[in-house]
């Protein structure tokens, strides 16, 4: 853990310099969130709705890709938010992104073809396509509306935690609703 932290800290400066190549400027608090993530390599971003969690996630992915720290990443989002993520991504970054969709054989081919860039999938799709996702071997995983993995016992939580990317970014507006265990599950 300490070794990973040192590696992230050492690479953060180069990645931070790439924020200047974004299509839009970040607010100071957004830049601070991205910087914290880049230095730590793992972060639970629990801002209120409307403060730009998605923009911060896209900026972090952009910086890591442009600095050569990652070549491919996975964005797991509620299915209803896929188009919003793609729109926000294209407004913020020029790094390649695609939504994986279609019949099972079409999705399998899309994972194989995505050697560089980022893919957007839904939580249910993660369950159906897990072997393809694992073979895709993302170097960063971003979870939006991460309260979906608050319960350790759910398949979604187990599948997400079975992935082992170098970078993890967890986004939620509600990190803890009822029990401390929910927060612990998000941090795991």
Regions flagged by a language model, labelled:
Residues 80-104:
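Conserved helix-turn-beta segment of the N-terminal RecA-like "Helicase ATP-binding" lobe
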Residues 50, 124-127, 147-150, 174-175:
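Catalytic acidic motif of RecA-like/P-loop NTPases
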Residues 70-71, 95-96, 137-138, 164-167, ...:
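Short glycine-/polar-rich loops that comprise or flank the Walker A/P-loop
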Residues 1-43, 87, 95, 113-119, ...:
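Charged, low-complexity
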């Amino acid at each position: 853990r300490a070794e990973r932290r040192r590696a992230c800290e050492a690479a953060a400066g180069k990645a931070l310099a790439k924020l200047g190549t974004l299509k839009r400027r970040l607010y100071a608090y957004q830049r601070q969130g991205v910087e914290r993530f880049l230095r730590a390599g793992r972060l639970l971003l629990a801002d209120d709705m409307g403060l730009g969690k998605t923009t911060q996630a896209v900026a972090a992915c952009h910086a890591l890709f442009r600095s050569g720290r990652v070549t491919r990443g996975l964005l797991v989002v509620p299915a209803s938010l896929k188009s919003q993520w793609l729109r926000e991504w294209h407004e913020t970054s020029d790094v390649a992104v695609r939504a994986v969709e279609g019949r099972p054989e079409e999705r399998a081919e899309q994972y194989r073809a995505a050697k560089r860039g980022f893919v957007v999938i839904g939580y249910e799709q993660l369950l159906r396509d897990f072997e393809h996702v694992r073979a895709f071997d993302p170097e960063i995983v971003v979870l939006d509306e991460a309260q979906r993995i608050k319960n350790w016992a759910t398949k979604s939580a187990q599948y997400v935690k079975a992935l082992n990317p170098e970078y993890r970014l967890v986004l939620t507006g509600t990190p803890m609703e009822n029990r401390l265990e929910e927060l612990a599950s998000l941090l795991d």
